[in-house]
Structures are given as C-alpha cells and as structure tokens.
Amino acid sequence: MVKEPNGVTRTMRRIRRIHFVGIGGAGMCGIAEVLLNLGYEVSGSDLKASAVTERLEKFGAQIFIGHQAENADGADVLVVSSAINRANPEVASALERRIPVVPRAEMLAELMRYRHGIAVAGTHGKTTTTSLIASVFAAGGLDPTFVIGGRLNAAGTNAQLGASRYLVAEADESDASFLHLQPMVAVVTNIDADHMATYGGDFNKLKKTFVEFLHNLPFYGLAVMCVDDPVVREILPQIARPTVTYGLSEDADVRAINIRQEGMRTWFTVLRPEREPLDVSVNMPGLHNVLNSLATIVIATDEGISDEAIVQGLSGFQGVGRRFQVYGELQVEGGSVMLVDDYGHHPREVAAVIKAIRGGWPERRLVMVYQPHRYTRTRDLYEDFVQVLGEANVLLLMEVYPAGEEPIPGADSRQLCHSIRQRGQLDPIYFERDADLAPLVKPLLRAGDILLCQGAGDVGGLAPQLIRNPLFAGKGGKGA
C-alpha cells in the first residue's frame, strides 16, 4: 500500500509499478529507494550489478542486469536518466505500448509537488550542500526526505523517506532537467561553464536557464544565492522572487567572518540580519565548504530551526562519500601518508580541494592522482586543467574517463602530461591501469604526504584498493 508522510497529499494514483532504466545511477537510485519506501513496486535495469543495485534489491526492487524489452513488462511508467535514449529496447518497447516514459527529474518533481521542496542547484557544491541541509534539518527534528547525488555517511545512503513534509534534493543543470522542479526554496551555489553541449555552447543560455529555474519558485518562495560567485551576482537583479544572499562578501545578507582551519575542521562566525553572531564549526576543510554551510544556515534559520540545532547539525556532519573522504593512513618508510578520495572533476573543484589541503595541512606535500572526466570537458577547459593540476607537488594522470564519448585528439591525459611538463611546473606520470598505481606511487611517497585520488570516473575505485594493498599495510579510517 502506498503511504505518504503526514500532511502530504498522495500522488500518482494510477501508478503501481515503476521501472527505472539505469537504476544504478547516482541520480536514479535515490528516487527509486524513496518510492520503494512509499510502497510502490520498483524494478530497474543497469549494465552491471553494483553495491547500489544490491542495496535496492534488498529493499525489494526487482533488478535486471542488461537492457531487454521484456524487463519493462508490467510497468505503469518508465523513468530514464539523460544517458538513456529512445533506442534503448526497454524505452522503445514502452513507447510502442504507450507506457509513459519520463525523465528522472520529472519523477523527482512529482515527489516534490505536494511537499515543501528545497532544491539545491549550481555547478559545484550541490551534493555537499544538500547533505548539510538534510543533516541540520534532522538535528532540528524535522526529519526530511532527501535525495542526494552521493552517499550521506551518517545515513549510509543517498536517499531516505522522512516523516515530515520537507523534501531536500539536488537540482541538476547538466541536462536542464531542473526546470521540471517547482520547489518552495531554491539554492544557487555558483554558475560555471560545464555541460555546455546542453546549452549549445552558449553561456548566456545557461545563465538564462538558471533564471528560469528560480522563477519556478512561487512568488512567496525563497531564492538563496551565493553572491561571492560573479555569475550569480550578475543574474541577481533578474530574480523577481524573495531572495537572501550569502557569502564572504561584505554586502551578503548572511556572511562568514573569522574563518580558521586546522586539518579537517573549519571554524567561523556567521552574521545574520537581526540575530546575534553565531559561532559554528564543520568537519570539512576549505572555504567552499564554508559557503555550503552558509547556504544551509540561511535555510535553517528561515525554517525556524534553533541555533543550537544548526550548530549541532554542522558540527556533527559526517560528510558525503567521495567528497574529501579520508580513507585512512598508508604506511610508508618513516611514517604514514593520509589517503583522500574526492569526486571533483572540474578545474574549479580541483582548485578548491587543493586550496583546502594547503590551508589545513600547509607543511605537507600533495601527491595527486587525477583522472579527467569526459573528452569534451578536457578539451573545453584544457588550459584551466593544465594550470590547476600543475599545483600539485607530484602528479599521476590516469587516462580520461570517456563517459560514453569518443576520444578527441589533443584532449587526453598524455597531452595534459606533455603540456604540464612543458611549463616546467612538474613532471607528471601517465598510467592506464588501476593495478599500475600502487607500485608506481609507492616510491614517490614520503612520510607526512597527502595522497589525493580525484575525479568522477573509475578513479573512485583506487582509494579502496590502495587502503587494502599489502604494499602499504594500511590502517583503514572512516570517511570524512
């Protein structure tokens, strides 16, 4: 039987079974899990089994490995990610039988329709900000439903059905699908040149789409915008909705001062209109995470969450999988090396993480293992990648993760190595296979180093492999 939290109208009355094509994806599995918890029958297919599909199976989802037309038999609706096209046999079969096929964001919008939706948009910082909001709301006793693009460490999942009317979710601009959402509160963390193929290579079109997204808010809704970002500041006058700004800038409505970082923990003071200054700390390094915390504080304050709960929720935040996740210590001659895994795959994200490391551990060397994500992104942001990757002390580059793209001449990791080497910043090392990394990197490591594995592709599997590798006799740690 389908059930809804108190005060939430039941939706999708004619729908019983929901089939997800590409159910293992970060944006898909969370929605599937919430629907399972609501009592819907859920099935889904993916190209390979994973911890995600196994988890959904334990919760009652029927999982198919591979895409076959018959997988969708009995479904009342198909949910597809932007990576799935009409030629997919399950989609083609559903269309032939006049079964509705909807994008992932439309299903998320349906979940949000009768809830108090809080949607977090922006090129960078969506997952962490969404996670922080969910954590602070939970600390305030509001028990939100959340759908996040990464695993919330405290909950062990990237989605959860709460008992309240609140739903907190990421709003994805990569395919402009966030335009389906009609939240009560919307955050814009920043706007950067990424996923430009969606916008025909036109940055102005991207900016206009963010403006359109914010105007999906009702006239009594709230836009929460980071004025430290120049593009967000630029579109601010176009937003005809109630707005609160945040940042480090002196003209921000809510701002952070007295910022101090030691290792993983960051302390700062929050200034809010008509409120006493609030001293907070968060167990994450970097100014970018101060900004993510400020967005959370704006929304929590607006929803009436107590300062005590805000401080508790931020201080006790246990992080998100692959967002500066500390795996533990690798044993090397003379001591150990801190092993960190991170999802950052845009030059601005890479720069923010490097800055956080330099700020929290100024005496340590940074040994970086990086995998570019998509040939098009590598091509479009090539000079930015050359500049930022050259800031490591030691750099190992894995081949580009294609994400379904064909190689582009001159936009690969070998060429990046060549360009960085030519500038005399350092001498990068190129490698192709996961198994090559441990013997390559071990002689390069010194006691006290930080080893950062970063990128959005299969580089995400390297840190778990290294911490178990007998070459290092590693002692595992908890994700940060």
From Swiss-Prot:
Cited SUPFAM superfamilies: MurCD N-terminal domain, MurD-like peptide ligases, catalytic domain, MurD-like peptide ligases, peptide-binding domain
Keyword Mitochondrion: no
Cell location: Cytoplasm
Binding site for ATP: G122, T123, H124, G125, K126, T127, T128
UniProt xrefs under InterPro entries: Mur-like_cat_sf, Mur_ligase_C, Mur_ligase_C_dom_sf, Mur_ligase_cen, Mur_ligase_N, MurCDEF_pg_biosynth, UDP-N-AcMur_Ala_ligase_MurC
Pathway involvement of the protein, from the record: Cell wall biogenesis; peptidoglycan biosynthesis
UniProt entry keywords in alphabetical sequence: ATP-binding, Cell cycle, Cell division, Cell shape, Cell wall biogenesis/degradation, Cytoplasm, Ligase, Nucleotide-binding, Peptidoglycan synthesis
RNA-binding found in the keyword field: no
Record-linked Pfam families: Mur_ligase, Mur_ligase_C, Mur_ligase_M
Protein family: Belongs to the MurCDEF family.
Name assigned to this protein: UDP-N-acetylmuramate--L-alanine ligase
Species annotation: Pseudomonas paraeruginosa (strain DSM 24068 / PA7) (Pseudomonas aeruginosa (strain PA7))
Organism placement in taxonomy: Bacteria, Pseudomonadati, Pseudomonadota, Gammaproteobacteria, Pseudomonadales
Gene from which this protein is expressed: murC
